[in-house]
């Protein structure tokens, strides 16, 4: 019989996400303190944060990997049954956006942390889009209200104008900067103050300060009006007599609207000063979904099929789970993190990887707390845990009951935009490096490794300079491999702009049996998804009447795909091309798979060069915050870098914010240049935006330099 300690309705699977430096990890550390997981508060600036357990995280003061933990909460006033909160603390730097992506896929709700000074910053927008993609309900916590320049209502306005959210504050800040003392609860219409003597463990209610009564009434009305929009019945009740609305009515209506992603409830505080995190935890329990709010999860029966399959979020259903992360642990080997959607699984059980169509066996199952492990015997619907001993599981694979297969929706991974050459310093390290890179790429789907066919060098590619720097550093620390690293290279792509028909023939007679392959291909440009290359090539078979036997068609496709990987114009991967094989011929004796593979390759290569081929380059979305006096110099420098200024706005911190689109090739070393231009007073962030055509004169020099190599 299944014994579940916490009812599934009392589960909350949440993420903590934000822009870098919004105080996200500090917020998580306070959560661990107030829920009793930690008896001492960890701090990012001292390198003692529980969730930032990697050495690089402690040294740099940033989150690099998504860390998982579990805590329990029964409310500030112990007003709830005990709720189990599974938390994933995700990175804020755009180079590690894959960690956010895979966490969003398996979470039920998210707490978006915003800086009370910086407001909605670039990575905040990226995380918001990722949450939208997976339709994850969320609440907001405006942090750092004790900081100079903090402005709560300005951040609320930015949530509306920058994210197009529908923010509904359920709290107001009492004071700001060094006068920030607590919050106004707009539902109870009381002031909440936390006791400094016990680091905010206890609190007390007070009357709202006189200077905030008018503002509180205004935002209280806004909150109630947002709540009653949930149903006509509630609206009628409100219009007939607004005093009839109970606290329960308001909270239930707000919760329903949060679950439908119609509103964003906003709370505030200062995690560092131990104020506001406690009431934000109450909001997690009251407004974010439990796994049962999902009701059921849908998937398909087979990889190539479209027959839908459904699992209800119950322990009694067949087991189904999604592997969302694979990590290497120095003590136990591979750790596979997974989210259980239905059923129960025990350590020692056999399960089925429905994506790879392989049976696996759960060795040990562990509950993770950052990098610490607690062994458990069973996991239930709604749980997030890690398995030790799974041999061939990748991020995005479905794990399920052997007798009841299902394939759940996976996740998309961005293609790398930057690459470098790596070379081990010793021959012994060279042999170990292959294994190390293989393990690192298994952990991180946005990290790629390959051998350059011409030079024989090992190339690694990722989402940015910091991303690759961290991975090379991990090779040194975790695998004891010292490596030389080349200069960063841009991940260019090749594509076509015209439609073309092209013949390809491969005929060879050398006495005895010869070789014969003959195809006609139609090459067409197609729109590409800039985030992933998974849909950047399509192959269609329009052969009729048996002019080419069907067993040779896959060989033609294979020949084309090899050319696509190696490039035609300058040796870069090809994207955005649709190929149709529509005619050709064969020889009953001399035709073979290899002959048609070569014929397909020849036709594609020659057709590509006739179809107006172009080079594409990654364009970065760049945001620069600079004092007003340096703005002219910064903009002039961006123009020299082929940048396009898309917007200028006033900064909540200093001066102005410049929004620009700049080719990645022009941004290497930009941090140093910006520091010298502005005497170290400006800051910038950038993330991949899209691929654009390289101007002809620059493309020609790139092509020539590749030919010389």
Curated annotation (Swiss-Prot):
Chief localization class? cytoplasm
Cite the InterPro entries for this sequence: EFG_II, EFG_III, EFG_III/V, EFG_IV, EFG_V, EFG_V-like, EFTu-like_2, G_TR_CS
Keyword vocabulary terms for this entry? Cytoplasm, Elongation factor, GTP-binding, Nucleotide-binding, Protein biosynthesis
User: Taxonomically, which superkingdom?
Assistant: Bacteria
Asked if the record carries the keyword Magnesium, the reply is no
Biological process annotations from GO: ribosome disassembly
Q: Which PROSITE patterns match?
A: G_TR_1, G_TR_2
**Domain tr-type G spans what residues?**
9-292
Q: Which GO terms describe its molecular function?
A: GTP binding; GTPase activity; guanosine tetraphosphate binding; translation elongation factor activity
The subcellular localization recorded is:
Cytoplasm
* CDD domains hit by this protein: EF-G, EFG_III, EFG_mtEFG1_IV, EFG_mtEFG_C, EFG_mtEFG_II
Which positions are annotated as binding GTP?
Answer: 18-25, 89-93, 143-146
Q: Kindly state one GO CC term assigned in the UniProt record.
A: cytoplasm
Family in the record: Belongs to the TRAFAC class translation factor GTPase superfamily. Classic translation factor GTPase family. EF-G/EF-2 subfamily.
Query: What role does this protein play?
Result: Catalyzes the GTP-dependent ribosomal translocation step during translation elongation. During this step, the ribosome changes from the pre-translocational (PRE) to the post-translocational (POST) state as the newly formed A-site-bound peptidyl-tRNA and P-site-bound deacylated tRNA move to the P and E sites, respectively. Catalyzes the coordinated movement of the two tRNA molecules, the mRNA and conformational changes in the ribosome.
Provide the protein name: Elongation factor G
């Amino acid at each position: 019989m299944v014994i579940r300690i916490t009812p599934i309705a009392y589960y909350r699977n949440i993420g903590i996400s934000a822009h870098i430096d919004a105080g996200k990890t500090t917020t998580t550390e306070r959560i661990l303190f107030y829920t009793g997981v930690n008896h001492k508060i960890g701090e990012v600036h001292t390198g003692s944060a529980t969730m930032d357990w990697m050495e690089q995280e402690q040294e740099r003061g940033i989150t690099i990997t998504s860390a998982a933990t579990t805590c329990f909460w029964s409310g500030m006033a112990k007003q709830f049954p005990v709720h189990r909160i599974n938390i994933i603390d995700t990175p804020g730097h755009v180079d590690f956006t894959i960690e956010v992506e895979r966490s969003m896929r398996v979470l039920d709700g998210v707490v978006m942390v915003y800086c009370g000074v910086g407001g909605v910053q670039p990575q905040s927008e990226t995380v918001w889009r990722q949450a939208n993609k997976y339709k994850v309900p969320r609440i907001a916590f405006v942090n750092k209200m004790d900081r100079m320049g903090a402005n709560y209502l300005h951040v609320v306005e930015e949530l509306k104008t920058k994210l197009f959210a529908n923010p509904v504050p359920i709290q107001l800040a009492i004071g700001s900067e060094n006068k920030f003392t607590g919050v106004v609860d707009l539902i109870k219409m009381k002031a909440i103050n936390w006791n400094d003597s016990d680091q905010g463990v206890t609190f007390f209610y007070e009357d709202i300060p006189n200077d905030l009564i008018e503002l509180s009434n205004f935002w209280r009305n806004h909150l109630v009006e947002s709540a009653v929009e949930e149903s006509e019945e509630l609206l009628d009740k409100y219009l007939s007599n607004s005093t009839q609305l109970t606290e329960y009515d308001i909270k239930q209506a707000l919760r329903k609207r949060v679950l439908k992603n119609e509103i964003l409830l906003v709370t505030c505080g200062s995690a560092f000063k131990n104020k506001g995190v406690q009431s934000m935890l109450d909001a997690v329990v009251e407004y974010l979904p439990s796994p049962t709010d999902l009701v059921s999860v849908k998937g398909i029966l087979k990889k190539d099929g479209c027959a839908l399959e459904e699992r209800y979020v119950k322990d009694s259903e067949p087991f189904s789970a999604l592997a969302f992360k694979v990590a290497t642990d120095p003590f136990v080997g591979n750790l596979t993190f997974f989210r259980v959607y239905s059923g129960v699984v025990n350590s020692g059980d056999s399960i089925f990887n429905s994506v790879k169509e392989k049976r696996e066996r759960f060795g040990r199952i562990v509950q993770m707390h950052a990098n610490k492990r607690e062994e458990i015997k069973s996991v239930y619907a709604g749980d997030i845990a890690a398995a030790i001993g799974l041999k061939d599981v990748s991020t995005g694979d479905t794990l399920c009951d052997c007798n009841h297969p299902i394939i759940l929706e996976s996740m998309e991974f961005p293609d790398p935009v930057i690459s470098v050459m790596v070379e081990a310093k010793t021959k012994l390290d060279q042999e170990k490096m292959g294994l190390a890179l293989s393990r690192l790429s298994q952990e991180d789907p946005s990290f790629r490794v390959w051998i350059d066919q011409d030079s024989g060098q090992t190339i690694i590619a990722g989402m940015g300079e910091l991303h690759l720097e961290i991975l090379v550093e991990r090779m040194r620390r975790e695998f004891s491999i010292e490596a030389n690293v080349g200069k960063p290279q841009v991940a260019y792509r090749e594509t076509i702009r015209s439609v073309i028909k092209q013949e390809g023939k491969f005929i060879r007679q050398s006495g005895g049996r010869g070789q014969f392959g003959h195809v006609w291909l139609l090459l067409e440009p197609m729109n590409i998804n800039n985030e992933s290359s998974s849909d950047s090539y399509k192959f269609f078979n329009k052969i009729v009447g048996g002019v080419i036997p069907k067993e040779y068609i896959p060989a033609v496709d294979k020949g084309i795909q090899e050319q696509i990987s190696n490039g035609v114009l300058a040796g870069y991967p090809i994207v955005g091309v649709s190929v149709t094989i529509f005619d050709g011929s064969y020889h009953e004796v001399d035709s073979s798979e290899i002959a048609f593979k070569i014929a397909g390759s020849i036709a594609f290569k020659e057709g590509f060069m006739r179809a107006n081929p172009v080079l594409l380059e990654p364009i970065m979305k760049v945001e620069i915050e600079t004092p007003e006096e340096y703005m002219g110099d910064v903009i002039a420098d961006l123009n020299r870098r082929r940048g396009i200024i898309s917007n200028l706005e006033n900064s909540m911190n200093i001066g102005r914010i410049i929004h620009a689109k700049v080719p990645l090739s022009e941004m290497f070393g930009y941090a140093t240049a910006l520091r010298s231009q502005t005497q170290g007073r400006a800051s910038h962030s950038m993330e991949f935006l899209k691929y654009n055509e390289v101007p002809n004169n620059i493309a020609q020099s790139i092509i020539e330099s590749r030919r010389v190599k």
